[in-house]
Amino acid sequence: MWHSELLCHHLALSILPLSRARSAQAKDERNIMSDEATYVPPRVWSWSAGNGGKFAHINRPTAGARQEHDLPRGAHPLQLYSLATPNGVKVTVMLEELLAEGYHGAEYDAWLIDIQTGDQFGSGFVAINPNSKIPALLDVSGADPIRVFESGAILLYLAEKFDRFLPSLQQPALRAECLSWLFWQMSSAPYLGGGFGHFYAYAPQKWQYPIDRYAMEVKRQLDVLDQRLADRRFLCDDNYTIADIAIFPWYGALVLGELYGAAEFLDVASYRHVMRWAQEIVARPAVQRGRRVNRSWGPEELRVPERHSAADIS
């Protein structure tokens, strides 16, 4: 009997430090949450002008045009209305890649949409994209103009229109792989941009919980890419496709230290396969040109606010 009591006593002593550690950790977490969880949601949410942090002056909980404003139109078959954010860069890179391969039907006019001043809420832009987000494309090469909005939809539209940068229907497995990675980017990037990027770089205050939560998810995504690229040149084996064109402006720019000033925080150098892939893509001449189009900030030599011919990108 006394052996059992002694064993229980020793077991309790061995568990005690772990229990105390867990208790201390729980206390720390409660302290963090008590500092941050001061907001009590009302029964029904209502908008105020201060909602939205850095972008509060343009964010609203309603859709539709806020002002009458027609969009300009140039002479080329494709009219792009955009800005050189990651989503905008996807499309200009795609167009520059097509032009580099001699697809003259991909000639385009790129018009600047200044999202800080609300250009995306003009009636002309909303007529092309009712969601008021860049990029938006108008194909005027046929009898009736075709509108395309959402960056992934534009990439897919252009890939099918020119039969380039997307495996053919005769390669169903490779095509499915490419489309899977394209839509992986569409579903994953909001955690990087609207989640991590917002709370790390743009929110009015620094809150640990959302930064930790989204940093964990972004690092998981980087690991997904790193494992995928460990034994292949591009996302779809040796084929440079719209999957790479879609993913690079977000995750390539991130590991190259160009997004949110978060390279060290996220230890991006540890994702060496993603880094190798990003460095190869950023060296492509068409990528370098596409990244400059609709850019209205940064060094003057990198800015090409509007593009109407190849001569605009010196």
Regions found by a protein language model. Give the residues of each.
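Short, flexible helix/strand-to-coil boundary loops that buttress conserved ligand/catalytic motifs
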Residues: L169, G193, E258, R291-N294
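A contiguous, mid-protein "functional segment" used to position or interact
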Residues: G88-T92, A269-R295
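GST-like fold's C-terminal all-alpha helical module
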Residues: S34-V40, A173, S180-A283
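Acidic/histidine-enriched, glycine/proline-rich intrinsically disordered or flexible terminal extensions
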Residues: W297-S314
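GST-like domain detector, emphasizing the conserved glutathione-binding G-site
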Residues: D28-D212, K219
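Ala/Thr-enriched low-complexity intrinsically disordered regions
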Residues: A12, A21-A26
